[in-house]
């Protein structure tokens, strides 16, 4: 889709903050270093795919050198013309590689049935379809949060996001309805992410040090699994890659 970035390669650093730390940091960041992007505070909805026994996230939380996630993502209030992103996110030796396509809710339903979408990168569509066909995954966890995103005034490639009110559910597994859910963490921390295409500027390191903000390995989906899902019995149902009588991919919802 024109105007939508479909490939990313960057380093992402994560930090767990209190609300007081986040407010103080925001004041400093917006005092000449960064600006809030055009969307302001907005809701992000994610639908994570996994196996029935959560094999992908169980492997991921072991912190291997290579890990991968497949998810759907939507920004803001869901409407019929809302863009839905299908994303394959890989991390290797600390570098994040993300490949994605975008479409309307109806487009995404067709894509998940195995159709190819007009106007989207055909190579990326093949990569995503191949991954879905080779792995027995289906929608498992809906995860939402409120985000404020900032970009660097000198280096627009520098991105900082602050996410709050992290919540999840394992019912109504789509990105097209409400964003209700149960808090992942009872203390409701703020998750700061610094996304870098280049080296981190010195002023940012100094600000983080000033506010006693230190890097963490926090994973939203991983924390959700450990706090709420790890002791559940596997829910065995047909996989997203299984085919119906017409030979089309049947998306389990």
Regions found by a protein language model. Name each.
Residues 1-253:
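Phosphate-end processing signature that detects enzymes handling 5′-triphosphorylated RNA
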């Amino acid at each position: 889709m024109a105007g939508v970035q479909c490939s990313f390669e960057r380093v992402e650093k994560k930090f767990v903050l209190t609300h007081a730390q986040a407010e103080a940091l925001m004041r400093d960041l917006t005092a000449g270093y960064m600006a809030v992007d055009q969307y302001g505070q907005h809701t992000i909805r994610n639908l994570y795919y996994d196996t029935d026994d959560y094999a992908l996230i169980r492997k991921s939380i072991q912190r291997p050198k290579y890990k991968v996630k497949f998810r759907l993502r939507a920004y803001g209030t869901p409407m019929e013309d809302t863009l839905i992103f299908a994303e394959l996110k890989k991390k290797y030796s600390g570098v994040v590689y993300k490949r994605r396509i975008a479409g309307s809710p109806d487009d995404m339903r067709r894509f998940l049935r195995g159709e190819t979408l007009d106007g989207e990168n055909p190579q990326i569509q093949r990569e995503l379809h191949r991954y879905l066909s080779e792995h027995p995954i289906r929608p498992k966890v809906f995860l939402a949060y409120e985000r404020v995103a900032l970009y660097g005034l000198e280096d627009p490639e520098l991105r900082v996001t602050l996410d709050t009110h992290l919540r999840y559910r394992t019912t109504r597994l789509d990105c097209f309805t409400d964003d209700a859910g149960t808090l992942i963490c009872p203390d409701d921390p703020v998750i700061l992410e610094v996304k870098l295409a280049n080296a981190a500027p010195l002023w940012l390191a100094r600000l983080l040090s000033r506010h006693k903000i230190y890097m963490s390995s926090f994973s939203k989906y991983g924390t959700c699994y450990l706090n709420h899902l790890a002791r559940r019995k596997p829910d065995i149902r047909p996989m997203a890659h299984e085919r119906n009588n017409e030979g089309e991919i049947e998306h389990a919802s």
